[in-house]
């Protein structure tokens, strides 16, 4: 089994109305419960807006701190889920299900394992 990162990318701007967001969150909770029951769920979390980020950069002996996101963009990492799956196809299926619930782009990426692949 391998771990995969399912990254949720959301656009800048106003979040959905409360009634829409409540429905999404309920469906997201049901999907998380299904992932747990299948032994696939490892961890998940939502992130605050990019404006709350702090970037740390070590440069020639100095630690530089910058407020705001590392890169400016129209979409940003809004949350993520880590799943354990036997193969990429299984991880992609969880990613597909997540994309259907949140209606946002999902990037599926495997973690580097100890063997280095």
Residue ranges of each PLM-predicted region?
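Conserved, structured core segments of small domains
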Residues: 1-117
């Amino acid at each position: 089994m391998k771990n995969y990162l399912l990254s949720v990318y959301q656009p800048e701007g106003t979040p959905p109305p409360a009634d829409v967001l409540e429905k999404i969150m309920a469906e997201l909770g049901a999907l998380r419960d299904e992932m747990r029951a299948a032994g696939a769920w490892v961890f998940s979390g939502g992130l605050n807006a990019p404006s709350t980020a702090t970037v740390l950069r070590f440069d020639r002996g100095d630690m530089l701190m910058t407020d705001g996101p590392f890169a400016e963009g129209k979409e940003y990492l809004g949350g993520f889920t880590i799943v354990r799956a036997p193969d990429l196809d299984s991880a992609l299926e969880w990613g597909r299900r997540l994309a259907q619930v949140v209606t946002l782009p999902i990037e599926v990426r495997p973690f580097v394992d100890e063997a280095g692949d």
